[in-house]
Amino acid sequence: MDALLQLKGIDKAFPGVKALSGAALNVYPGRVMALVGENGAGKSTMMKVLTGIYTRDAGSLLWLGKETTFNGPKSSQEAGIGIIHQELNLIPQLTIAENIFLGREFVNRFGKIDWKKMYAEADHLLAKLNLRFKSDKLVGELSIGDQQMVEIAKVLSFESKVIIMDEPTDALTDTETDSLFRVIRELKSQGRGIVYISHRMKEIFEICDDVTVFRDGQFIAEREVATLTEDSLIEMMVGRKLEDQYPHLDNAPGEIRLKVDNLCGPGVNDVSFVLRKGEILGISGLMGAGRTELMKVLYGAMPRTSGYVTLDGHEVVTRSPQDGLANGIVYISEDRKRDGLVLGMSVKENMSLTALDYFSRAGGSLKHKDEQQAVGDFIRLFNVKTPSMEQAIGLLSGGNQQKVAIARGLMTRPKVLILDEPTRGVDVGAKKEIYQLINQFKADGLSIILVSSEMPEVLGMSDRIIVMHEGHLSGEFTREQATQEVLMAAAVGKLNRVNQE
């Protein structure tokens, strides 16, 4: 089968860094090509070379069989290559049609926008994707999943033959993911080629036909997905076997550190649980069940309307995140780019931001040497891959950004560490490193709450698991009792609380 798009021998270097070396990618009509690799493997750089954002240093790009060079995203877009970024590129205050044809509005012979034609064309594109809403609806009124469908419709408006999807399900519910997969199958049937960039193994094996593996900027292999197992694919990605994906540390938890009684707040109703020293408490549940809301009420980022929280036997009241930090409760957000990190600031500034009191003199000036020493220690402990602590954190991979976010929380010397989706958007190798760090904190007696949508992660790392459903606690299980089936039954409200101390 002839490829729609073929990149061969692609090299790209930046000062001091060889980002791509002999990289290759083929995209075939009517097939989904997964592009996988650890964070920093070169996937994003390859997409920027492909779409003309970066100029390649060496190699060839064949588009529809002809040697081609794109001089920017507009050039590749007009040629028929569409890209849907992880962060959606839509304006909430405009309608669907206005977003789809922004800058390309239909104009009548009097020089005015032909609204009737524009909405008709947009409705036609939505119908191609079997979507039930009309194009006169505001984008801001749509769910994230439906907004993603608008991005696909926008790509189709350019008559794109190849569509690149970057972590497309990162913010989607299971139902929205199913809808996306139906659309991808429809696009395949129309002969379009899809590039599917994802860390989620389950999705790759469900929706992709072929897979291309990158490692350290190099092309490793192209295989049919049907010929692989998850283990063999991961081994190609990381260059080694991951013997134990979830390295659980089996030690006896200590005395009760945190006690929550009848806690209520926005999206949280009458929740009670305990957390012991040196224990990992997993929090499971479906999207919208109230897991993140519970953590934010506990930490002080959302108001508590009733209930009691005691820490080491003393009642604590957290009316703000500052109160949470002052009492030894640290919350690492599920959205590190929005809530957790200042992307334009350096690794050092991000890591020490909430711990500046520890590096301040009486007069308010900073002890810069102490700050640098502490940041350097954490960079080594966490194996953060960065040229220097002065590097802008926005330039690091997702896994390294997450390590910095966790390190920042630990700099305040907390008693309770809340990790909300700690490995979201993180590759398999970096995940393993984060799990090992979590075990290290656990061994040191830190009390950890692990909130995750990935059931294998919760099952693999937790000592106990509580499940939430519609703001309530719907189940509590020991490690031995917990299975995916039991957790799912509790998550949909079909199982009563069965655990017991």
From Swiss-Prot:
CDD domains: ABC_Carb_Monos_I, ABC_Carb_Monos_II. Residues 5-241, 252-495 form the ABC transporter domain. Its main location: membrane. The keyword DNA-binding does not apply. SUPFAM superfamilies: P-loop containing nucleoside triphosphate hydrolases. GO terms for cellular component: plasma membrane. This is Ribose import ATP-binding protein RbsA.
